Amino acid sequence: FNTEFWQSPQAEAFFRSVPQGKLLILDLYCDVTPGWPKFENAFFGQPWIWCIIQNFGGQVSLHGGLDIMAADLRKAFEQRGKASGNMAGIGYAMEGLCYNPVIDEFQSDMIWRTSIPDTTEWLSGFVKRRYGKDSLKAREVWGKLHQTVYQQNQNHGNILQAQPSFTYKVTKPDKTFALIWKSFLDISDEVGKEKTYQFDIVNVTRHALGLLAPLYYGKLITAYLNKDRDALKAAYEKMDELINDIDRQLATNSEFLLGAWLERAKRWGHTQDEKKQYEWNARKIISVWAFDGELNDYAAKQWSGMMRDYYGRRWRHFYKSIDKSLADGTKWD
């Protein structure tokens, strides 16, 4: 909705103009801004679906408002026939799956429930199912994820995937998550052979390394502002090393490979021209998205191949251009 226009009178006129039961409403963004509490009997008695978007553009992220989801779902369940009106089901509006399986599974599980469980209790069962055994250490480390990244209902992205500029916020590395990453490594002796763990450790490592990016970015920008080319070079080399480290560790799991994405796209083609076209489309959608560039990086991917050969090259061009401006004594543009 355009919230400025769609006040209660406008919404009521719209929803009541359709016979009851002849309209099914998808409340798309209930994990962040649910629409159903804003109106009488949710959507004036029309059947509606409690949905989450959670992921835009299939971006690779580690986030999800697990407790926020549970709280709003619990409220909707308990107020059926009253404030939540004619809630008819639970749905998905994600633009990508895979990278936060705990959120996907929680949403799926709630479809079959008549009441919403305590998230801590539910998470213990999830960990056991995910790794095929009941590991206390695994449950503990997932509990730490629950209290950090899975309290965040929005993806804030990463500087490394952003178009280089001077405008990004500089933050200190998150030592808390570094300790979680270490704990995740420590459970490999119990669950390390499970493919689900092998996926998870790459995902968690990727996120932990990415949290170092603002540190090196800050040093890069400070060096430029101080017109210190030696410090600028040192900061860039650290940033480039980080990008390459992330790329190498992503290459250890097939779910994080640019090449796998491109090969799947080409398989849809029956001729060489079709294969080339599908590959071009696959490359375009994860980079510039469209022709006018207004959605650049909308579907940004932390994949091996993308980190080093796409994002890494962009930062290299940025470094060279700002270093040249210092060498020439000119303003960077």
Where are these regions (language model features)?
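Catalytic-core regions of glycoside hydrolase
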Residues: F1-H146, Q151-N155, Q163-D174, N226, ...
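Extended, compositionally biased alpha-helical segments that mediate assembly or anchoring
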Residues: R308-D333
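Short, solvent-exposed, charged loop/turn and helix-capping segments
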Residues: I187-I201, Q249-R264
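C-terminal substrate/ligand-recognition segments
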Residues: V170-G192, V202-L225
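Short, Φ-rich (hydrophobic/aromatic) sequence segments
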Residues: I103-I111, T205, L209, Y311, ...
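Non-catalytic C-terminal accessory domains or segments of carbohydrate-active enzymes
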Residues: L215, Q277-N281, R314
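Secondary-structure edge/capping motif, primarily at the C-terminal ends of alpha-helices
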Residues: A223-A231, S325, G329
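Short amphipathic alpha-helical coiled-coil/interface segments
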Residues: W142-L145, W181-F184, L209-A213, Y217, ...
